[in-house]
Amino acid sequence: MKPSEIARVLTENLKLEKYKPCGVCFSDNKPENALEIKKKGNGCVVPMILKASTGVAFVVSEESTGWPCSAFYLGFQDHIFDGIEYFLSNKDDFFRPCEKFIQNPELAKSLINNINPVKPDKKYIVIKPLEDFNESEKPESVLFFVNADQLSALSFLMHYDAPEKFDRIIAPFASSCMATITYPLKMAMNN
């Protein structure tokens, strides 16, 4: 199915009104008028991913990854920062307030050590509306934003042909860029 057809089917059937389904791909070319974070180490990529779903392409390169976490999760560097396991867990004497998302540093370290993000094989990761993909482009993964009712409908639909299956939907711990880019790319590359 062509990307534009995927976009049409998702938009019509899920009644997506506010945000457009987007595709994620790798490219050596930056789309015209694409948004890009100005420099490495400054800013979160997630608001830009949301902006892409309103119709404006967004690119990430090694020079424009935003925060160190994004650089790691998007495959542009092999290390986040020293002490990430404390930042994600419960160590109170870290240099900044901890997020306390994970019970302890050991569990957080285990998570980080097992992420293994997909390494981009081209200069850019491109996130743009599926309807803007040309005939020669193929999305590696698809992302779209939904409300709670739409998410519920998707959950039911995933079990339409096999209601006894319990492994069709996963919700692993993840930052927003991991959930929208890292994990879907890994799943796509493994299929």
Regions found by a protein language model. Give the residues of each.
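Acidic, serine/proline-rich low-complexity intrinsically disordered regions
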Residues: 3-191
